Amino acid sequence: MHYEKFPDGTVKCIEDKIPFELPEGWEWTRLQAICEPITDGTHKTPTYSDEGFIFLSSKNVTSGHIDWDNIMYIPESLHNELYARLAPQKNDILLAKNGTTGVAAIVDRDCIFDIYVSLALLRIIGYIISPEYLLSTIASSTIQNYFNSSLKGIGVPNLHLEHIRTTLIPVAPINEQYRIATKLEQLLSFADKIESDKIFLLTTIDQTKAKILDLAIRGKLVPQDPNDEPASILLERIRAEKEELIRQGRIKRDKKESVIFKGEDNSYYLKIGNLVESLNDWQIDDIPETWGICCLGEICDYGNCINTDTKDISENAWILDLEDIEKDTGRVIQRLTKKERNSASSKHLFHKGQVLYSKLRPYLNKVVITDDDGYCTSEILPLEFSNIIFPDYARYYIMSPTFLRYANHCSYGVKMPRLGTADGKKAVFTVPPINEQKRIADKINQLFSLLDSIVKNMD
């Protein structure tokens, strides 16, 4: 059984407070029994200055480390007052009382500084406890769970000094403490390396996916088939059909029609009205001979959306919002109805098989092909492509680094950048023969599936 003796001589059984049994030679003790009087920093909001003495708060304490870069300063007069009350020193432990509650770090440098009320200061008595051992103990799930259960307050929960002082700490023999601290350091270093390698691999996979898309839209991902009907013939057919519709008066000619042509220098140019601009930035001079080049607005109804008032939408209709689409993948991560979403704004109607493109914050790269009819936020454009464009190829093209770079460059607005309709319509689009588009999409799906399986097996 475990008992605790109090200063007045009384003894109390604390068996129900003991978290677990310890090995022989270990003992449970209160944190206040192994530290000098535990206190916290100043309770007064300080007056900061551009220079002076370092002033730390819980914002400067992360798990196991003190952030000495993003610090505040206080004037000498205030420092003298605070330092006379509490003078932190090297090897003290700073424990966050609020904010990132329960997070602690060892003071790892010999310098003069002061602390705010959000930090408690633990200074070990003598050499009975290794600072590294105590830090690892505080970081354990047992102590953290105790801290979390002791939080007080509603807005910003606080860990009161009394609960810190009475925290039960398992104390190992001093030599074993050092062995534990050394082993933990080795394991944590190994874990950090694994995490670093994982981040590197994830970054490499993202870069590989981007490179695959880049090769795909330049005709370098799958071999060409000379028997495929050239895309240029298909594009000419579309243009001829459009001219016929204009002649019949069924549609009007765009006053600022975008036309891509090849100059005498064998480079591509974009003509809009009387303006001509080079397309060298698109790097399309070496696409296969069977491919064609056009503006996005020539092969889809970019910007021609059907707006629907919310009162005309069924309660059970699918309402797609930007937050429902995972960035960079084109996956729909949640599906809500109008009743579940409770949205009052008008929506864009979309149909199964259309490519949906988020014009808002294009850097998030949210592009999806729908598997059902529904309605979406007005920041998403449903794109209906002509029958010479395979939807999966169109989606991958719009997700490619080349298109993404263009969309980000043309976006307007600082906080909420979006791609304008005119810029979207004149975006360059490389068109392979329809059969090659399918082969490209199949190859991308195959390669992406392989890369995704690698990521999945990392978890």
Predicted regions and their residues:
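Flexible, glycine/threonine-enriched loop-and-boundary segments that flank and lead into catalytic domains
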Residues: 1-24, 69, 80, 88, ...
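Low-complexity, Lys/Gly-biased intrinsically disordered segments
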Residues: 13-16, 27-66, 81-83, 101, ...
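Intrinsic disorder at enzyme termini
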Residues: 1-15, 205, 209-289
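A short beta-sheet element
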Residues: 57-58, 76-139, 156, 164, ...
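Amphipathic alpha-helical coiled-coil/heptad-repeat segments
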Residues: 145-146, 166-252, 406, 426-459
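Non-catalytic DNA-recognition/assembly elements of restriction-modification systems
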Residues: 12-40, 189, 197, 201, ...
